[in-house]
């Protein structure tokens, strides 16, 4: 079943990379955003973020009865993800409960490692903890998704 899950997400990995590349190009061209760190490191670590998000999507699909329910749950998760990730408000200024919730969201780690690599020129030694967190998130979500998928669809 992991082969089935992988075949389902591969096209979305490509789409995720296209979105990131377009965002970086627009940021650099239009907003004069500097890119101080390693582009190779950034794009390698972007893979983990894209896969983390896709693993969340797969988990949502295993819980959902239909496509509309999956879409509604995904939309329901977007706003808290953005607000708790440190994208809008600094996580240091959040109450500890909200900060803890933000640590359960993959975008939190991706924002930190993106800022470190792109804006500060940091290397892997500065982002390995965030990368590890994304890897743990992926492992937990994929494992849980496979278990849920088997319970639901495999007799």
Which sequence ranges carry the predicted segments?
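Alpha-helical transmembrane segments and their short interhelical loops
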Residues: 1-74, 79, 128, 142-143
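Membrane-interfacial helix-loop-helix junctions in multi-pass membrane proteins
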Residues: 34, 86-140
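Short, functionally important structural connectors and interaction interfaces within domains
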Residues: 22-23, 27, 63, 81, ...
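Short cytosolic juxtamembrane segments of multi-pass membrane proteins
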Residues: 147-155
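Aromatic side chains
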Residues: 12, 17, 31, 49, ...
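Hydrophobic transmembrane alpha-helices
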Residues: 13-14, 46-51, 73-85, 91, ...
